[in-house]
């Protein structure tokens, strides 16, 4: 190796090996190799043969006295060939562990011992290359095994100076992005050569911001005063409530607005949009579909199905609902009759697909949970955020339901309840269908499988606390849009000019099996859920029994997602994220969004992954949407001119919601309709941010997703802006039969007053029918002179209804024209003509 000198530097020979140096290096290697006769021997310290005679072989001669290092004639293969007793003896001789009671320190590990011996052999064979002296062989193996210093002497300070009189040498800046490899702080070796430490595990995980950096713990306050409550809680629960506050600086918002053409919007124009966008929906009428279902024959191939014939419901009253003016293909409320429940169970719970092959459940579940942690969590934030606000959430939950009469005494004993028994029902609301298939297919309602309220109220606080910790530990590029501290609104992030990945997982709930349940258990333990509770929760999800008491239908199920328990949304989100991290390298994405079974990711580079693993390994019917669009949770993601991203509800689905048939008709009570109006206004809070730039994006994404013309988006947005202005305009979209009947029946009251226009006595004026006006519930007579008011009251024996109006008018015409009353009519029979 060429040494540094001024002569070699000026001659240009620095860094080049001369022939003399090459010959010297070869001679040195030849002398060193002469001490090693075979490939099975390596030099070692001389005290190895004395301390470890079991490692010497009789067929290998001892080294000469001139050789400073002796040879050890065993290989890694020798250790692998040893029995457990022999390898244990080698471990005790080399590592020399200590015993604290029954605990061995360090703990014996055969693979680690073999690796330490192999590294020690390699270090001794290259001992001349190190400036410091290595330890003896046995101590060297023990140091590598324990992760201690492998050198025997203290570090040597470099005294050699590279300074040359008259010359100044500056370090060369490497423009190719060269970065020094990480060195182990204990042994000084390069990270990938160090066998005693995992540098990747010790690396600081502050590369990405998390929600815990933005939200700090604001206060801790005691909230529980009930001693009985505290006595029934576990030791891991703390009777305090934590509050978080946002600490990042608030940025001034600039909303670029534009006028919306609300003056040209009408019900007819919105109906024209429906006719164009939803051609099969405008003729859809499901008024008698329930009758067709109940009167037709029904066959099912579900095994282990139990029907209770005494509970069969042939027909159920659908109730009174407001009639929408728009025809958007919205379905009527579904009734949980026996045949409707059987149809829903066959589609939602039965016919479970079996697409995956045989896998090692334990190994795969642990590996997927490990990948989940590495892909999404900031490990330091996870370690620091070890507080679970279970008691505070439980107290808030009980206060929320205190108005309904729920108290702590009403909570059942979970150990005395059969947690494998679930109640079942069908959803009365059917999700709007955007495909043009309503003319040939009737949508099947979704099902809900749930525990009783008392059981859910005891599990919900724990899972809410785990979800809060889960959100606080997520990396900054992972978004779960739920709760108060996360949403789809993303500042300083644009969805434009990026590759998009949108995975559609169909039959998500019933396709989950034992592998998905074990993955959830591993992740729950990772988040700090007590192991006994997570195991208990997963045990009664392995085999369950669902029962629809109203329809008299019951059947057993196993593993699949319970769609109405305390862990439904959280569990579905965890499963989606875990499957996504296993099939795709999450480091290639700039932003990832997950919500239930929906997922969306953005990348600057073309996306690479194994989407077929969703089916072959995880038993999921996955569809990679092509072309992918920034669409999640039935919302489009748009970016404004300032580079901020916000969400816009799907215009097609919002248009369908305007024609819903499931708003109860309260007559004069408009509370139900007003609640729908407030929800409609809340969903349209994005309207002030819509500009020509964002509307153009919405049209493009709309056309990409639905393969339909986006020209109707302008009319839809104008309609949304008009009908979200005030409640009076919104009421034009619905017709109330109860309100019509109430207005008609209001004219059949007992008190009627007949007002006549003034008649001049000097002139004979011909009376006509327009001179008589009827008013109901008039309490004050006009005081204008020249008016005659006749007070009349119908007999209480007369019939009420529309015919009563005619009889009252006839009776009023028979009253005296000369009698004038300045006060409301008194009760009693009407006065007779004199």
From Swiss-Prot:
Keywords: Nucleotide-binding, Nucleotidyltransferase, RNA-directed RNA polymerase, Transferase, Viral RNA replication
Chain spans, region Disordered: 774-834
Biased composition (Basic and acidic residues): 806-817
Entry keyword Magnesium: no
Domain RdRp catalytic positions: 498-611
GO MF, one example: nucleotide binding
InterPro entries: Bromoviridae_RdRp (IPR047309), DNA/RNA_pol_sf (IPR043502), RNA-dep_RNA_pol_alsuvir (IPR001788), RNA-dir_pol_PSvirus (IPR007094)
EC identifiers of the protein: 2.7.7.48
Catalyses which reaction(s): RNA(n) + a ribonucleoside 5'-triphosphate = RNA(n+1) + diphosphate
Keyword check for Cell inner membrane: no
PROSITE patterns assigned to the protein according to its UniProt record, in alphabetical order: RDRP_SSRNA_POS
Chain coiled-coil ranges: none
BP terms from Gene Ontology: DNA-templated transcription; positive stranded viral RNA replication
Function: RNA-dependent RNA polymerase which replicates the viral genome composed of 3 RNA segments, RNA1, RNA2 and RNA3.
Family: Belongs to the ssRNA positive-strand viruses RNA-directed RNA polymerase family.
Subunit structure as annotated in this protein's UniProt entry: Interacts with replication protein 1a.
The protein's name in its UniProt record: RNA-directed RNA polymerase 2a
Organism, scientific name: Peanut stunt virus (strain J)
Organism lineage: Viruses, Riboviria, Orthornavirae, Kitrinoviricota, Alsuviricetes
């Amino acid at each position: 190796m060429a040494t540094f000198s001024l002569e070699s530097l000026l001659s240009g020979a620095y860094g080049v090996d001369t022939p003399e140096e090459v010959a010297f290096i070869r001679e040195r290697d030849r002398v060193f190799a002469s001490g090693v006769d075979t490939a099975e021997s390596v030099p070692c310290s001389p005290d190895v043969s004395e301390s470890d005679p079991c490692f010497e072989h009789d067929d290998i001669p001892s080294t000469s006295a001139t050789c400073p290092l002796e040879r050890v004639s065993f290989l890694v293969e020798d250790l692998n060939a040893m029995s457990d007793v022999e390898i244990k003896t080698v471990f005790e001789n080399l590592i020399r562990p200590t015993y604290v009671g029954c605990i061995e320190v360090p703990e014996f590990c055969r693979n680690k011992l073999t690796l330490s011996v192999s590294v020690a052999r390699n270090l001794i064979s290259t001992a001349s290359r190190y400036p410091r002296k290595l330890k003896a062989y046995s101590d060297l193996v023990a140091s590598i095994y324990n992760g201690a210093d492998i050198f025997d002497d203290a570090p040597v300070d470099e005294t050699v100076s590279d300074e040359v009189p008259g010359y100044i040498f500056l370090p060369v800046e490497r423009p190719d992005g060269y970065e020094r490899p990480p060195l182990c702080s204990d042994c000084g070796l390069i990270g990938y050569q160090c066998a005693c430490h995992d540098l990747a595990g010790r690396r600081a995980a502050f590369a990405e911001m998390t929600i815990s950096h933005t939200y700090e713990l604001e206060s801790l306050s005691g909230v529980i005063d009930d001693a009985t409550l505290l006595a029934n809680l576990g030791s891991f629960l703390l009777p305090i409530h934590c509050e978080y506050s946002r600490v990042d600086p608030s940025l001034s918002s600039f909303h670029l607005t534009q006028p919306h053409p609300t003056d040209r919007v009408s019900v007819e124009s919105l109906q024209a949009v429906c006719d164009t966008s939803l051609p099969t929906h405008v003729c859809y009428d499901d008024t008698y579909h329930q009758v067709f279902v109940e009167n037709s024959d029904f066959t099912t191939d579900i095994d282990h199905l139990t029907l209770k014939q005494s509970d069969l419901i042939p027909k159920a009253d659908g109730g009174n609902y407001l009639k929408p003016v728009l025809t958007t293909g919205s379905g009527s409320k579904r009734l949980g009759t026996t045949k409707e429940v059987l149809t829903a169970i066959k589609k939602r719970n039965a016919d479970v697909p079996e697409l995956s092959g045989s896998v090692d459940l334990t190994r795969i579940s642990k590996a997927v949970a490990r990948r989940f942690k590495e892909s999404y969590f900031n490990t330091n934030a996870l370690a620091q955020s070890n507080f679970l606000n279970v008691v505070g959430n439980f107290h808030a939950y009980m206060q929320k339901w205190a108005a309904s009469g729920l108290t702590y005494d009403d909570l059942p004993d979970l150990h005395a309840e059969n947690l494998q028994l679930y109640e079942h029902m069908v959803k009365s609301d059917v999700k709007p269908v955007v495909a043009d298939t309503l003319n040939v297919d009737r949508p099947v309602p979704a099902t809900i499988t749930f525990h009783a309220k008392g059981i859910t109220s005891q599990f919900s606080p724990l899972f809410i606390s785990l979800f809060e910790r889960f959100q606080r530990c997520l990396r900054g590029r992972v978004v779960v849009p739920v709760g108060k501290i996360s949403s789809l609104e993303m500042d300083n992030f644009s969805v434009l000019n990026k590759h998009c990945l949108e995975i559609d997982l169909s039959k998500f709930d019933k396709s989950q099996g034992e592998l998905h349940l074990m993955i959830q258990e591993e992740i729950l333990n990772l988040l700090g859920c007590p192991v006994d509770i997570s195991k208990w929760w997963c045990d009664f999800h392995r085999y369950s029994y669902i029962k629809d008491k109203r329809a008299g239908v019951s059947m057993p199920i196993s593993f699949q997602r319970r769609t109405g328990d305390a862990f439904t949304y959280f569990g579905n989100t965890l499963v989606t994220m875990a499957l996504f991290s296993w099939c795709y390298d999450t480091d290639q994405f700039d932003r990832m969004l997950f919500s239930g079974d929906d997922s969306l990711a953005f990348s600057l580079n073309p996306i690479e992954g194994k989407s077929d693993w969703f089916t072959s390994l995880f038993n999921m019917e996955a569809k990679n949407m092509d072309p992918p669009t920034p669409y999640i949770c039935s919302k489009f993601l748009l970016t404004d001119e300032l580079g901020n991203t916000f969400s816009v509800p799907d215009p097609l689905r919002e248009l369908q919601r305007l024609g819903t048939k499931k708003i109860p008709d309260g007559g004069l009570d408009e509370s139900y309709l007003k609640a729908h109006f407030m929800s409609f206004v809340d969903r349209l809070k994005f309207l002030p941010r819509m500009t020509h730039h964002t509307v153009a994006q919405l049209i493009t994404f709309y056309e990409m997703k639905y393969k339909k013309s986006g020209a109707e988006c302008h009319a839809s947005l104008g309609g949304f802006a008009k009908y979200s202005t005030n409640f009076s305009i919104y009421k034009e979209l619905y017709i109330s039969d109860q309100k019509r009947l109430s207005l008609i029946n209001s004219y059949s009251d007992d008190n009627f007053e007949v007002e006549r226009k003034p008649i001049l006595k000097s002139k004979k004026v011909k009376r006509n029918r327009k001179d008589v006006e009827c008013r109901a519930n008039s309490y004050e007579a006009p005081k204008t002179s020249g008016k005659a008011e006749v007070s009349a009251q119908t007999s209480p024996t007369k019939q009420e209804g529309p015919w009563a109006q005619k009889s009252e008018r006839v009776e009023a015409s028979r009253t005296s024209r000369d009698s004038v009353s300045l006060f409301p009519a008194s009760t009693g029979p009407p006065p007779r003509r004199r």
